[in-house]
Amino acid sequence: MDETVYLYKGEVFYFKDSPLKFDESYSYYPDGALVVCRGKIIEAGAYENIKERYPEAFVTDYSGKLLMPGLIDSHIHYPQSEMIGMYGKQLLDWLNEYTYPTEEAFGDSEYAGRVARFFVNELFRNGTTACMAYATVHKESVNALFSVASEYNMQMLTGKVLMNRNAPQSLMDTEESGEADS
């Protein structure tokens, strides 16, 4: 695994406790730094206090930009990665025209794996380090997502979606098939 140390300079803001505790709940460094190694944040704080400890770090300067590490998405659908922004007049139109046809492909392990890798990389690229993600009715989709998340040591809750009505037959489960595949 890559042992390069990355130092990101900018305005660093993160929560360390419940936001209900107001002033005690966060840390803010107007001239801050995040230090990352092997995909993990190993230190955050004032740039002046950190920079000398990492002389070999690859530095990216985001001065004037807000850096917020460790976002958590508590409701996201990984199978919808390829249809972000698709228009639908109503939810049912959108499900029938885009969602269901897209989700039918997730029975293919190779396809599910490609989308899972894209999905996890997009989460990280946007600062999300943990999530609760919906998969599809296909066990292959769940296995692919767990596999990629594990490879990156990402904290994730996910599981097989169970559908037994209001969807195409190819996406439906019975109680027995849902239990067998879970």
Task: Give the residues covered by each predicted segment.
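Metal-coordinating catalytic core of metallo-dependent amide/deamination hydrolases
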Residues: 140-182
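Structural motif
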Residues: 5, 58, 129-130, 155-157
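Short coil-to-beta-strand
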Residues: 2, 88-93, 151-157
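Divalent metal-binding segments
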Residues: 90-141
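N-terminal metal-binding scaffold of metallo-dependent hydrolase/deaminase domains
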Residues: 1-53, 65
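Hydrophobic faces of well-ordered beta-strands that scaffold small-molecule active sites
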Residues: 72-74, 131-133, 156-160
